[in-house]
Every structure is written in C-alpha cells, then in structure tokens.
A protein has these predicted regions:
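Short, extreme N-terminal leader segments that mark the start of a protein/domain
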Residues: 1-20, 285
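Short secondary-structure junctions
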Residues: 3, 24-27, 44, 106-113, ...
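Conserved donor-binding loop and adjoining core beta-sheet/short helix segment
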Residues: 16, 22, 26-97, 207-234
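Short, glycine/charge-rich beta-strand/loop segments that flank catalytic centers
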Residues: 87-104, 114-118
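Short catalytic-loop micro-motif centered on adjacent basic/acidic residues
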Residues: 89-91, 154, 257-260
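Acyltransferase donor/substrate-recognition loop-hinge adjacent to the catalytic core
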Residues: 106-177
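Short, conserved active-site entrance elements at the starts or edges of catalytic domains
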Residues: 159, 163-211
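Aromatic (often tryptophan-rich) hydrophobic motifs at membrane interfaces
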Residues: 201-290
Length: 290
C-alpha cells in the first residue's frame, strides 16, 4: 500500500499502533496526531506490520515520525532504504528512543525541539491540589466559586455539542487569532466536536449558573490522561483551574500521569504549565541521518 493522506477515517487502522510507543509523549495519540494531520500534510503507510507516517515541516522538508510496530529499529532502517536522498529527517523522536536512532548507519545529528517538550504531571496531584505549592491553584478555584451562585461539571456527549459550539464561537470572537497553529487548532476543535464518536475522546463541560464557561477534550492511553483541548471563559476568574481539576478528577483517577502537552514557545503558556509543577518534561528531538 503506498503512502496516503491521513484522514479521520484512518483512526481505527492507525490508533492500535500507538501501543508500541513506550513513552508518554502526546504525538502518538489520536488527538495529538489527527488534529494536526492537515496542518502538517501528514501521510501514512503500513508495511510488514509497521506504521510509517510522514509530515511536512514548517521549513518545507519531509520528516518521518518514529515508525511504530514490533520491530522499531527495522522500521527506522527501512526509512533510510526507501529514502535514498540525504539527509533523512525524523521529528518528535522521544528521548527514550534516541538510542535506536543513534544506532543507525551514517552520521546522525540530533537537535532538541526545545519548545515541544510535553509537560507531565502527577495525576494524584492534579486531582488533590494539596500542599503549599498548589495554594495558587486553590485560590483561583475559590475565586471561581465566589463568582457564581452554582456550578456543575459533566461529561461532554453528543447532546452537548451544539451548545458547546455556540460557546466556542462566542469565545473566539473575544480573541484575535491570526493564521497559524492557533487558528488550525480552533478549526480542528470544531472538527472534533462534529466527529466526537470517530475521535473517541473523553470530554467535560464546566457550567456556571447553568451556562457553559469551559470545556475540555482528551484521551486516556495506558497510564496517562492526555489533555488535548482546554477552553474557558476568562471573564470567569478561576474557570481554567476549576475545569482542569474537575476533568482530572473525572478521568485521571487511578492513573499515574496527566500530560498537558507542550508550550510551543509561548511564554504565557509556559508559565501557566510550570505553575502546575510538572514532575518532568518529556523532551523530543529532530534527527538528521546523513
């Protein structure tokens, strides 16, 4: 089968290969891969039990993702064989998989993707928010509770989609998005809402006095809850903190980690993610093989 453009109809074929990843990076999840498939012109192929996927970087070059299957080293070597031009480029290679690429023949150049390390948190800490280091988060939640007369958090299902879409459109009118990753994310949020069952994500809706003030979408894979989408109305102080805690309480109970993904170099986002005290950051690397 030749490489083909990635679509949401491919989720049932591609998703089972994520079990071969031994790290908790968000790139090998349904939301992490399929929400960005169009922006990065992603294509895929399965050959001899190995999933190969490619993307076009913002520099215009073709990159391979980490091949997924029973024999990842053989998949990496196959990328070199099928791509005789040099260098052969790989992206978002998890730090734990670097020994595999270092073993490839040729000169291997490795560069850290500093803005794309995932923030990994303790699931228990995200639920409890106990101790001095989380006092700021608890204060934000207390402010949210003082702002509204009543509140609720409930699972997001198909019956909520129309109301969530209305909230999302209203929220976006307050923001001035320019073309790029933020605009693409918003486009894909709409797609996920319209194809909730195909994506198979879990979600939650936060209400204040009956009105939606935030929603989240994510997925559970192995021991980790991945938070792909988190949107809240900042006119309700503390809504983001309340939304995060309730979502983790609903879906991360009994898990080990919560992955809140990367900061993409956004300094405000970086501060917000660091303020939640991650247990570690999962580094990723670009690799060129000459």
């Amino acid at each position: 089968m030749p490489f083909q453009k990635m679509t949401i109809d491919d989720i049932p074929v591609i998703a089972p290969y994520f079990r071969f990843v031994t790290t908790n990076t968000c790139d090998f999840t349904v939301g992490g891969m399929f929400m960005w498939r169009d922006y990065f012109h992603m294509a895929w192929q399965v050959k001899d039990g190995v999933l190969y996927s490619t993307l076009t970087g913002e520099d215009g070059n073709l990159y391979y993702n980490l091949p997924l299957g029973e024999d990842i080293p053989a998949g990496l070597r196959q990328c070199l064989t099928r791509h005789p031009e040099r260098p052969v480029r790989f992206c978002t290679i998890p730090e734990a998989e670097l020994p595999l690429v270092r073993a490839l023949p040729g000169r291997v150049e490795i560069t850290e993707e500093e803005n794309f390390a995932d923030y990994l948190y303790s699931a228990e800490e995200m639920i409890r928010l106990s101790g001095k280091k989380f006092s700021g988060q608890r204060n934000h939640i207390s402010r949210f509770l003082r702002t509204c007369r009543s509140w609720s958090f409930e699972p997001l299902n198909n019956t909520d989609v129309a109301e969530v879409e209305t909230f999302f459109h209203t929220l976006n009118k307050k923001l001035n998005y320019t073309p790029g990753e933020a605009a693409e994310e918003n486009h894909k949020v709409q797609e996920v809402l319209e194809h909730l069952d195909q994506y198979g994500l879990v979600g939650g809706v936060l209400r204040a006095d009956g009105a939606i003030v935030g929603f989240t979408l994510g997925e559970v894979l192995r021991d980790t809850l991945y938070i792909h989408i988190e949107k809240a109305d900042r006119d309700y102080p503390g809504a983001y903190q309340m939304l995060c805690r309730q979502f983790c309480t609903a879906y991360a109970d009994g898990l080990t980690y919560v992955n809140r993904e990367e900061d993409m170099g956004d300094l405000g986002l970086r501060k917000a993610k660091r303020d939640l005290h991650p247990v570690t950051q999962l580094k990723k690397y670009t690799v060129e093989v000459w």
